[in-house]
């Protein structure tokens, strides 16, 4: 074969290989496009939630062409529908309390970016439970932490994060902006309410499904405020207790009934309760009960009983002689269902809770009568109705050598149980005013739930060494 023939033969071979390579590439491209359309055209049928993965791998070593395609498609059950929560189950029997979660936020914040918060709570939805709190818009180690002892500022926001973690700028979800809040899930979506603005003209913004739906102006011009723990929904109706007016005199309290973030009805407070703030609410047996703070007079807590079906309420005081506000006098010989029991100094009150279920009733309170230190749970049968009722069982939650703070009720209404299991949290306040060597005021959280077993006591205190922050 002469040189010209060799050149022609080599050229023809090269062109043939190039054409073959081109055809393979075109075929591979067509296959990839076909797979994409095939995955995207999933028929609309009721099938289980599954992950399907289609993989195509093409390797042409002779021409150094490598093509790897990995397509993952998540197919959701389009016919799956959520339903409104229905509060028909009773409360579970409780003989003691087991630990659920403790976030250790202050301990972790000594060496990490942890948000300064207060007024925390927990609230659950069909997927699980989350922690909530009002952030101060800064971290424990941030310079803006100076002055966070103040309750109201334009830098506060309701944030939520995964239960058990410490709140940080990296895991916290902003629910709404404000310095007073409540939040609850109706089984379909979450409603969150935040108050913000100046003391004499604050307003509330109601969010539902991640969007603002309703705005509420101040009606008394004196710090419009709400529960600082979760609200509760029944068949889509979510009552919320709000107060506007003096903290140490008669104020204007309203029970506002929402559905999907929109106002259905507004009621002025009726009944025996003389002052209402910071209610802790739970639902069972078709009824919602809110145990509140009388910041004006009472060391016994006011109770609001709400019928969400017909959107009405009544109010009275916890009848038991076991007083649960702080500060408070010594427990008297008799309780009072119809009027506040006065006494105690210097603090006018603290947010608290109770579960009122006949013989299965439990009350929470600080161990100290005069300050927010220690915490205990007392089983007090018929505390709601019996002025002679006293404790038959006791469990320490935080010892009296450590600070506590606000406390409140919550329930995982979607747990797979035949009854609603009561749960509660305790705010563990650190920093100012009691610990003035640091510039900030913040908290960690401990949460416990009911147990039919008889479990022992332990102190679930905050545990941070303030000296490490100096």
From Swiss-Prot:
UniProt-annotated glycosylation sites, renumbered to this chain: 51, 54, 62, 67, 70, 86, 146, 201, 402
General remark: The influenza A genome consist of 8 RNA segments. Genetic variation of hemagglutinin and/or neuraminidase genes results in the emergence of new influenza strains. The mechanism of variation can be the result of point mutations or the result of genetic reassortment between segments of two different strains.
An example molecular function term from Gene Ontology annotations: exo-alpha-sialidase activity
Active site: 151, 406
Modification after translation: N-glycosylated.
Region feature Head of neuraminidase, mapped onto this chain: 91-470
Catalytic activity: Hydrolysis of alpha-(2->3)-, alpha-(2->6)-, alpha-(2->8)- glycosidic linkages of terminal sialic acid residues in oligosaccharides, glycoproteins, glycolipids, colominic acid and synthetic substrates
Disulfide bonds: 92-419, 124-129, 184-231, 233-238, 279-292, 281-290, 319-337, 423-449
Record's keyword terms, sorted: Calcium, Disulfide bond, Glycoprotein, Glycosidase, Host cell membrane, Host membrane, Hydrolase, Membrane, Metal-binding, Signal-anchor, Transmembrane, Transmembrane helix, Virion
Record entry for activity regulation: Inhibited by the neuraminidase inhibitors zanamivir (Relenza) and oseltamivir (Tamiflu). These drugs interfere with the release of progeny virus from infected cells and are effective against all influenza strains. Resistance to neuraminidase inhibitors is quite rare.
Major enzyme class: hydrolase
Spans through the membrane: 7-27
Family, per entry: Belongs to the glycosyl hydrolase 34 family.
Name of protein: Neuraminidase
Main location: virion
Intervals, Virion surface compartment: 28-470
Topological type in the membrane: Single-pass type II membrane protein
Function: Catalyzes the removal of terminal sialic acid residues from viral and cellular glycoconjugates. Cleaves off the terminal sialic acids on the glycosylated HA during virus budding to facilitate virus release. Additionally helps virus spread through the circulation by further removing sialic acids from the cell surface. These cleavages prevent self-aggregation and ensure the efficient spread of the progeny virus from cell to cell. Otherwise, infection would be limited to one round of replication.
GO annotation, biological process: carbohydrate metabolic process; viral budding from plasma membrane
Cofactor(s) it depends on: Ca(2+)
Region (Involved in apical transport and lipid raft association): 11-33
EC number, UniProt record: 3.2.1.18
Subunit structure: Homotetramer.
């Amino acid at each position: 074969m002469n040189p010209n023939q060799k050149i022609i033969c080599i050229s023809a071979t090269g062109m043939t290989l190039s054409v073959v390579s081109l055809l393979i590439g075109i075929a591979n491209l067509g296959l990839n496009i076909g797979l994409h359309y095939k995955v995207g055209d999933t028929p609309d049928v009721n099938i289980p939630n599954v992950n399907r993965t289609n993989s195509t791998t093409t390797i042409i070593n002779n021409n150094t062409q490598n093509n790897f395609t990995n397509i993952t498609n998540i197919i959701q059950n389009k016919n799956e529908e959520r339903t409104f929560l229905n509060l028909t189950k009773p409360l579970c029997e409780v003989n003691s309390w087991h630990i659920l979660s403790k976030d250790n936020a202050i301990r972790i914040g000594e060496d990490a970016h942890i948000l300064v918060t207060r007024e925390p709570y927990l609230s659950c939805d069909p997927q699980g439970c989350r922690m909530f709190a009002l952030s101060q818009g800064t971290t424990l180690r941030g310079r803006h932490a100076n002055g966070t002892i103040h309750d109201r500022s334009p830098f506060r926001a309701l944030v939520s994060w995964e239960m058990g973690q410490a709140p940080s700028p990296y895991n916290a979800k902003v629910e709404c902006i404000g310095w007073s809040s409540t939040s609850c899930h109706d089984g379909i979506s979450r409603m969150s309410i935040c108050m913000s603005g100046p003391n004499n003209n604050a307003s509330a913004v109601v969010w539902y499904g991640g969007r603002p739906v309703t705005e509420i102006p101040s009606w008394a011009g004196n710090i419009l405020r709400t529960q600082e723990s979760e609200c509760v929904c029944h068949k889509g109706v979510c009552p919320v207790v709000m107060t506007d007016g003096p903290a140490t005199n008669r104020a204007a309290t309203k029970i506002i009934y929402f559905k999907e973030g929109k106002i259905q009805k507004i009621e002025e407070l009726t009944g025996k309760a003389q002052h209402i703030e910071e209610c802790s609410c739970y639902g069972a047996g078709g009824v919602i009960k809110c145990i509140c703070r009388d910041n004006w007079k009472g060391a016994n807590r006011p109770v609001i009983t709400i019928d969400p079906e017909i959107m009405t309420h009544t109010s009275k005081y916890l009848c038991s002689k076991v007083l649960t506000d702080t500060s408070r006098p010594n427990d008297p010989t008799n309780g009072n269902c119809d009027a506040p029991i006065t006494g105690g100094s210097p603090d006018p009150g603290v947010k608290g809770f109770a579960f009122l279920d006949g013989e299965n009733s439990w009350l929470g309170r600080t161990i100290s009568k005069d300050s927010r230190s220690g915490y205990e749970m007392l089983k007090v049968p018929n505390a709601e109705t019996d002025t002679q009722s006293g404790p038959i069982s006791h469990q320490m939650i935080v010892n009296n050598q450590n600070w506590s703070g606000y406390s409140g009720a919550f329930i995982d209404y979607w747990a797979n149980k035949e009854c609603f299991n009561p749960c509660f949290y305790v705010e563990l306040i650190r920093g100012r005013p009691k610990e003035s060597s640091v510039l900030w005021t913040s908290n960690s959280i401990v949460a416990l739930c009911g147990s039919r077993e008889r479990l022992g006591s332990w102190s679930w205190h905050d545990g941070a060494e303030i000296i490490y922050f100096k």
